Amino acid sequence: MSDVIKDLSELRLSYEQGELYETQVASNPHEQFLGWFNHALAANLHEPYAMSLATASASGRPHVRTVLLRGATEAGYDFYTNYDSQKGIDLAENPYAELLFYWPSLERQVRVGGHVVKIPEQESTDYYHKRPRDSQIAAYISTPQSGKIESRELLQQRFQDLQQQVQSHEVLDKPEFWGGYRLQPDYYEFWQGRPNRLHDRLSYEKIDGQWTLHRLMP
């Protein structure tokens, strides 16, 4: 065993912040999510709306990355990206994904899984025009997203060139290859760290249109 692994094996914390019982949670998992999410916002955490998005290709190879939550209703959880990105390719082949919100200072995490669909085009357009101008420009030049590029300097040059080209444009059209996705949840898991690794885990599963609550082994 290497020294690094040996050192890591000694690193651990005891979770003491809270507890989670069936009698404390909402019957609707989205309401429970909003309660925890608003708590994270009120705690002034750094980007509590950041979430890990896990997708998988048709062959089963997983990919995970951090994206930003841009809408949350009972209908689903929204994020925006380049449709030609790896996540877009995965979702075209296998339209199921999971989100993970992790708030370490609260010793909490939430998993949300389900089917993913594209957001209506007008909603994507409306959101695109709310973005800062330079972020709109960046969406144009970062394509295909995850594609290889020779250097940072070339990326910066393309950005500056497009800035100059559209300087006189009052409004930029949304690129056709860019827009939103909505994860329509059929599964939630709420995790609260507890002492001695006896963590609280409560899951909600959607069965025949109804949410069923279960406690999971830690």
Curated annotation (Swiss-Prot):
Assigned keywords, A-Z: Flavoprotein, FMN, Oxidoreductase, Pyridoxine biosynthesis
Gene3D superfamilies: Electron Transport, Fmn-binding Protein, Chain A (2.30.110.10)
Binding of FMN, residues: R65, T66, V67, L68, L69, R70, Y80, T81, K87, Q109, Q145, S146, W191, R201
Catalysed reaction, written as an equation: pyridoxamine 5'-phosphate + O2 + H2O = pyridoxal 5'-phosphate + H2O2 + NH4(+); pyridoxine 5'-phosphate + O2 = pyridoxal 5'-phosphate + H2O2
Cofactor: how bound: Binds 1 FMN per subunit.
Listed GO biological process terms: pyridoxine biosynthetic process
Signal peptide annotation: none
Domain of life (superkingdom): Bacteria
The EC number(s) this enzyme carries: 1.4.3.5
Gene Ontology molecular-function annotations: FMN binding; pyridoxamine phosphate oxidase activity
Pathway membership: Cofactor metabolism; pyridoxal 5'-phosphate salvage; pyridoxal 5'-phosphate from pyridoxamine 5'-phosphate: step 1/1; Cofactor metabolism; pyridoxal 5'-phosphate salvage; pyridoxal 5'-phosphate from pyridoxine 5'-phosphate: step 1/1
Record family assignment: Belongs to the pyridoxamine 5'-phosphate oxidase family.
NCBIfam families: pdxH, PRK05679.1
Protein name per Swiss-Prot or TrEMBL: Pyridoxine/pyridoxamine 5'-phosphate oxidase
Lineage: Bacteria, Pseudomonadati, Pseudomonadota, Gammaproteobacteria, Moraxellales
Gene name for this UniProt entry: pdxH
